[in-house]
Amino acid sequence: MHPCTRRLRRSATAVLALCALAAVLAAPAGAATAPDKWGATFCTETIGWLKGAQQGATDLQTKASDPSITPADGKALIVDFLSTGVASTKAYGKALKAAGAPGITNGTKIQASILAGIAGSGAKLAALNTVAKRLPTRPPAAFQKAATKLGNQLSSFSEPFSKGMDAAGKLDKGNQLGKILTTLPECAALANGSVGSGGTTSTTGG
């Protein structure tokens, strides 16, 4: 297997695994919204975001499996993948913010914590995309080394989001939000783990 192929596959797997953490949740900003209405919007947007990430990773893996791929090709694929991730994450955060804060105890604070986490992870992803655009393509060994380093840096992408989820979990008194989401049909795919890998049924970890 060509070094580029191995690197791209590993990078795609890493990103997909990190994106799957989003199944934990993400919350909006604005006026208080009925919890069930907010939950339906949240789950719909989250599932769409996760499926987009999964499809992107699948497409990347398929293209990376071409034995004739060159370092330049590999760089272009990585940049395209990360650029799409940056755009989709921004859109995801914007949609959740527009949904308004869930009308529960600490709803506004929960919203702020999660949105901050999404923004932080989005910023890290954007920074990684900048690095990807500067990846050397000659000699091939230089690309492999730089791509490997990028893949390692990618492991920290979810840290801001995870911190936001942890903070939200502590704010979700009595797991109010989590309990509501488990009753919504729009959230079934997140609850049963059929979207993403390692997903969880609780939005706030409470």
Language model features with spans:
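Bacterial N-terminal signal peptides that target proteins for export
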Residues: 2-15
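C-terminal region of N-terminal signal peptides and the immediate post-cleavage residues
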Residues: 12, 22-41, 200-204
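Short, intrinsically disordered, charge-biased short linear motifs at domain edges
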Residues: 25-32, 169-177
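Disorder-to-helix initiation segments
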Residues: 30-46, 60, 67, 71
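Alpha-helical segments in soluble extracytoplasmic regions
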Residues: 49-132, 146-167
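Amphipathic, charged alpha-helical scaffolds that flank and support histidine-based chemistry
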Residues: 130-140
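Short, low-complexity, Pro/Ser/Thr/Gly-rich segments in the mature regions of secreted, periplasmic
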Residues: 182-206
